[in-house]
């Protein structure tokens, strides 16, 4: 039975189009018998922004403050959750040409030298191997494969850095460019999601 971790990151709650799409995928994969864990990074599972104190604490040590220890424990739990799943589904709506802050916070908690990646004589090596990722990215305009799409290259770089190179991308494009464009973008995204197997 496949285990799936879903990361929601939209700040729009019930109005979120990325949530609409990922919920479509969740329903489909649950019907196929997948065990799905949902982490709502902009809702009930919001994470703190990593500051200097937290960043220092994530390196570990024997003299951590209570806050640093709490954040290290949280990071360890997030990494364990990541490694325990076979597929990671990431929703990434475009906000001002970038990913939501809430998703970046998760990345900062799991990107740890010696834990999810390491440095070798031949360069960095990812330690989260044998996983698959699905990126669901929604945007109001049309940015796919263009110079304004920084989201997909960034997320592919991050995932590859920690060892996840099997990455599929589903685009919801031009969703704020009128009702017809929205309907077309959602329909095409759902078709792409329907083609994915768990």
From Swiss-Prot:
Role: Quinone reductase that provides resistance to thiol-specific stress caused by electrophilic quinones. Also exhibits azoreductase activity. Catalyzes the reductive cleavage of the azo bond in aromatic azo compounds to the corresponding amines.
Family label: Belongs to the azoreductase type 1 family.
Binding site residues for FMN: 10, 16-18, 94-97, 138-141
EC number(s) reported in the record: 1.6.5.-, 1.7.1.17
Cofactor: FMN
SUPFAM superfamilies in alphabetical order: Flavoproteins (SSF52218)
Origin: domain of life: Bacteria
Alphabetical list of InterPro entries matching this protein: Flavodoxin_fold, Flavoprotein-like_sf, FMN-dep_NADH:Q_OxRdtase_AzoR1, NADH:quinone_OxRdtase_FMN_depd
Protein name listed in UniProt: FMN-dependent NADH:quinone oxidoreductase
GO molecular function terms attached to this record: electron transfer activity; FMN binding; oxidoreductase activity, acting on NAD(P)H as acceptor; oxidoreductase activity, acting on NAD(P)H, quinone or similar compound as acceptor
Reactions mediated catalytically: 2 a quinone + NADH + H(+) = 2 a 1,4-benzosemiquinone + NAD(+); N,N-dimethyl-1,4-phenylenediamine + anthranilate + 2 NAD(+) = 2-(4-dimethylaminophenyl)diazenylbenzoate + 2 NADH + 2 H(+)
Pfam families: Flavodoxin_2
Organism of origin: Shewanella sp. (strain MR-4)
Chain's gene name: azoR
